[in-house]
Amino acid sequence: MTTDSDTALLFDPALALPSGPAPRRTSVGVRVGSGPGSVQVGGGAPIVVQSMTNTDTADIDSTVEQVAALARAGSELVRITVDRDPAAAAVPYIREKLDKMGCLVPLVGDFHYIGHRLLTEYPACAEALAKYRINPGNVGFREKRDRQFSTIVEIAAKYDKAVRIGANWGSLDQELLTSLMDKNAGSAAPLSVGAVTREAMVQSALLSAARAEELGLKRDRIILSAKVSSVQDLITVYRMVAARSDYALHLGLTEAGMGSKGIVASSAALGILLQEGIGDTIRVSLTPQPGGDRTLEVTVAQEILQTMGFRTFVPLVAACPGCGRTTSTVFQELARDIQTYIREEMPLWRSRYPGVESLNVAVMGCIVNGPGESKHADIGISLPGTGETPSAPVFIDGEKTTTLRGEGIAAEFKTIVQDYIERRFGGAKSAAE
């Protein structure tokens, strides 16, 4: 029983908590690429989705095919490995073929060990790339490291390219780490090995960025990352980097893993940081199944951002998980079919029906929550549960509009969805024209 005091407490405005993420961390905006395909990372711009190919970059046709597939899936930046001479020689041809296809997605060159030489000897490669990714832990050692790092930065400044300086747990600057470990050993209150390693990660990224600026690379050309494989360590490291700088930040686990493990790890780590306002671009590093679809990492990245309310990419399909009241698989099959249908149609819908990505669809499985959830969606259908009347009421904008019956429910509901989209979003295209 609720008392008067309980009721007052429930409606006390002072107890209400705001919904939504913390304000975005202020960061320097970095323009990656030029022309129609360019994107801004940081500076208040929408959080950018990026991905990476796993083809042999020297295989021009395969790389072009995969870059185009990733871009069609929604990747706004695509990184390619540039690890040897044939790969560097192929880059301008890859760019040319993509441009001819109308695929303007900016390409990021991933350099390790010999990036200084490849960028020097293949100037067409240096020009064709929109951004360079370098790892301060494997540019070189001592004087050689300084010289090789300087070469890459000077080339980036010459061509006005963005640079991601990416420290990695697995290839951390050993000189810096050893120095910090030695200092820690002599401390009156030494930190744990993990704490010192995290500090080394942060310092590696920040010191390298400061050196890049000294060499003439503008602040609005620098993006930082500090990647590890542990979710908790990643969260801590990025909090540290965010607190000490205003560089744009690239988020991602070094190796998230395969299947559901990789998806959960990335969602947990990135979700917490994004909720705290940290992060300007994300990549979900999933280990693909043999022959698996590389675009899955793009889909997961988009779903993280859309689920958290940062961006909208495709209409959301909400479906109940099922229980003993839903022994039929009809609602599961319909939810799957509608989700597939929407993703297949989105390339066309995106251009024809501006704003369609904000659509919410509900496919529910029984009378308990079905009608209510369906009313909250833009379009919803409540399928019959076990023992219920074999009919499926359809709700549009909160109002029941029709009831579907028989074997053609799925096809009829798809038609209703298509008609609603044309009616609600078709006018936006006409108005724009």
UniProtKB/Swiss-Prot annotation:
Binds 1 [4Fe-4S] cluster. The keyword Oxidoreductase applies. GO terms for biological process: isopentenyl diphosphate biosynthetic process, methylerythritol 4-phosphate pathway; terpenoid biosynthetic process. It catalyses: (2E)-4-hydroxy-3-methylbut-2-enyl diphosphate + oxidized [flavodoxin] + H2O + 2 H(+) = 2-C-methyl-D-erythritol 2,4-cyclic diphosphate + reduced [flavodoxin]. Transmembrane segments: none annotated. It is an enzyme of class 1 (oxidoreductase). Converts 2C-methyl-D-erythritol 2,4-cyclodiphosphate (ME-2,4cPP) into 1-hydroxy-2-methyl-2-(E)-butenyl 4-diphosphate. This is 4-hydroxy-3-methylbut-2-en-1-yl diphosphate synthase (flavodoxin).
